[in-house]
Amino acid sequence: MPLSVEQALANFSQRYVEAWKAQHDCLPINEELVGLASPCIEETRDLEISWQPIVRDEAIRLHNIEQGIELDLHDDFHAFYGTQYSADMTAKFEDMNIELLQVWSDEDLERLQGNMLGHLVMQRRLKLVPTLFVAVTDDEMEVVSICNQSGEVILERVGTKNRTVLAANMAEFLNKLEPVIAA
């Protein structure tokens, strides 16, 4: 039986934390999120926080986006953003470096929903098949997204029809990721 998106995300998150611990002998550390509340925070120091992913008590669906654009969003999208809190995590997919986007807090979730709504409105204006971004790449004009129609995970050039299929679904994509931990 194939893994669910929720399980694949939990597995990758665990691999990420374990890789960080193996390299740094502590939980992941972040300097950019200092001062931003989150259930992920384990310890706060002057210029950094240590954190770990936290599974939500109850999974959520991002209905605000669906209502705002009048479009049903793919279940993999809801599962990816609605099951845990986490800082963004760096990874490698084949030879491509990515930063897997995550929800740090409920306030961050509101920001994500606004950004996703703007992304979908732009795609509608350009008459593009709707996609739902899940990661950024080294090239600021390329993002990794879920195709809302097929559920395939794709690399897309923002605002264009240039799309390359990376995986048949989000669980498969997450299973192929390798954590990348900065020195």
From Swiss-Prot:
Keyword annotations: Cell inner membrane, Cell membrane, Membrane
Chief location bin: membrane
Keyword check for Cell membrane: yes
UniProt key word Membrane: yes
Pfam families the record matches: Syd
Protein's membrane topology: Peripheral membrane protein
Subcellular location: Cell inner membrane
Transmembrane segments: none
Gene Ontology CC: one annotated term: cytoplasmic side of plasma membrane
Similarity comment text for this entry: Belongs to the Syd family.
Physiological role: Interacts with the SecY protein in vivo. May bind preferentially to an uncomplexed state of SecY, thus functioning either as a chelating agent for excess SecY in the cell or as a regulatory factor that negatively controls the translocase function.
Name assigned to this protein: Protein Syd
Source species: Aliivibrio fischeri (strain MJ11) (Vibrio fischeri)
Lineage: Bacteria, Pseudomonadati, Pseudomonadota, Gammaproteobacteria, Vibrionales
Gene: syd
